[in-house]
Design a protein with these regions (language model features):
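Short, Gly/Pro- and small/polar-rich lid/capping loops
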Residues: 1-10
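Active/ligand-binding-proximal structured segments within catalytic/core domains
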Residues: 11, 18-69, 143, 180, ...
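Short hydrophobic-aromatic micro-motifs
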Residues: 13-16, 229, 238-240
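Active-site-flanking beta-strand signature of metal-NTP-handling nucleotidyl enzymes
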Residues: 26-29, 238-241, 400
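Acidic, glycine-rich loop-and-beta core segments that form the ion-binding/anion-interacting portion
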Residues: 201, 233-241, 249
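C-terminal non-catalytic interaction appendages of large macromolecular assemblies
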Residues: 219, 235-238, 256
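Flexible, small-/acidic-enriched active-site or ligand-binding loops
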Residues: 224-225
Length: 418
């Protein structure tokens, strides 16, 4: 997968990825702004803006925006992360001009009508409530807070009810004006379409975008710690993690392979030892989360109140074992899993759009899949053990727990096990 990059005079970048054998196309607009770019008083504003972009423009009301894409069988959506916000449409190939027009409209001509703002404020408050009532959801917010306390990257993407209630139309309009600039945005299309016609339409639709304003972002500084909440539940939802690495760290792929060996599937060490052998959990897995200037590694599990006392020592033991010994069979299996996942994703126009958009946001260029596969194949057992040892030696443990916590050890005792 290699997308062609075109840069317009105003700095807007366009990535075209033509797939002539398919009948669909996915077009996305990536903006280089997420919850980590917010001040404390703005926490949740990126997410609210993403919602409000669909609630009316100068020429379409909220219903029009929903119907115009669905009338042709298309799908329109968006999502906010800590570093980016993405708006996209998935359509039949002949409907690409319509989808692009709608995206350009909502990203440049939203009116933030007061009645719609009040209505959507209620929707987001319900979303926050749903997240708070879902232990295996809210525990991830607690983990971020433990890892990055009192920082934008450690705050919840949704914000708080009080802050959501405080946002005004002027707040939304000002935030969009500050951050939705040509040099901070990338338009990506993957699927069956005419490349020249698409680039020409993007140039026409986004001609009014101005160049970027210098927006400063606080660096992500990992600390570690414990965030917990006692709840009357059947299970303890638990996240245990360490400081991770950036996307461009030389150990990035070794870290991914390490995570796969430790907790990346039914054949992983944690699944086999914790679930299959001991029956302590239904689900357990590990994952890496990287940012442009940091990252984290974590293990998520759900277990009973009494079982948590056995679970944590077993997890610690498995991590120490992995730092001392990894078989070539395990590494080969993890590499195969990563490569298969990558190659399978290339059959989806939406997955390709997301990969290209993310690569442009992070690296400023599309990364050919052959280059990624080459880096995966370079990882050996020594690199995996070395990275695990590197991570454990820092020993900045982050712990988040929600549920019946009577048997949970205090932070220092947990940290000492690792």
């Amino acid at each position: 997968m290699t997308g062609k990059v075109t840069t317009l005079d105003n700095g807007l970048r366009i990535v075209t990825d033509v797939m002539p054998h398919v009948e669909t196309v996915t077009v996305g607009v990536w903006t280089d702004v997420g919850s980590r770019h917010e001040t404390p008083a703005q926490n949740g504003l990126s997410h609210m803006l993403e919602h409000m972009a669909f609630k009316g423009t100068k020429k379409r009301n909220a219903r029009d925006i929903a119907e115009v894409v669905e009338n042709v069988g298309g799908y329109l959506n968006a999502y906010t992360s800590r570093e980016h916000t993405t708006y996209y449409a998935r359509l039949l190939k002949d409907d690409l001009p319509l989808g692009l027009n709608v995206l350009a409209d909502i990203l440049q001509h939203s009116v933030f009508e007061p009645a719609e703002l009040e209505r959507e404020r209620g929707v987001i408050i319900q979303e926050i409530g749903q997240s708070n009532d879902t232990p295996d959801d809210i525990v991830f917010d607690y983990f971020q807070e433990a890892a990055y306390p009192d920082q934008p990257v450690g705050r919840p993407i949704l914000g708080t009810v009080d802050l959501v209630n405080s946002f005004s139309r002027d707040d939304l309009a000002g935030y969009m004006s500050d951050h939705y600039k040509a040099e901070q945005m990338v338009v990506v299309a993957s699927g069956n379409f005419d490349q020249d016609s698409f680039v020409q339409q993007v140039e026409q639709e986004f001609a009014g975008l101005s160049r970027a304003r210098d927006i400063k972002t606080d660096p992500a500084v990992y600390h570690g710690g414990l965030e917990k909440q006692q709840r009357d539940l059947e299970q303890v939802n638990l996240l245990i993690g360490f400081e991770g690495i950036t996307f461009d760290d030389p150990d990035f792929y070794a870290a991914q392979i390490m995570s796969m060996v430790l907790g990346g599937g039914m054949s992983s060490r944690l699944f086999q030892e914790v679930r299959e052998k001991r029956g302590l959990v239904y689900s357990i897995y590990s994952f890496m989360q990287s940012y442009v200037d940091g990252g984290s590694f974590a293990i998520h599990a759900g277990t009973g109140e009494e079982q948590v006392a056995e679970l944590i020592p077993v997890v610690a033991d498995e991590m120490h074992k992995l730092s001392a010994s990894v078989s070539s069979e395990e590494v080969n299996r993890a590499r195969a899993q990563m490569k298969a996942g990558l190659l399978m994703s290339l059959e989806s126009t939406t997955s390709r759009m997301e990969q290209l958009g993310r690569q442009m946001m992070i690296f400023g260029r599309p990364i050919p899949h052959a280059e990624i596969i080459e880096k995966i194949d370079q990882v050996d057992a020594v690199a995996v053990m070395r990275y695990m040892d590197r991570m454990l030696s820092d020993n900045k443990l982050s712990v988040a727990a929600v549920g019946p916590l009577g048997a949970l050890e205090d932070y220092d005792k947990i940290a000492a096990r690792f």
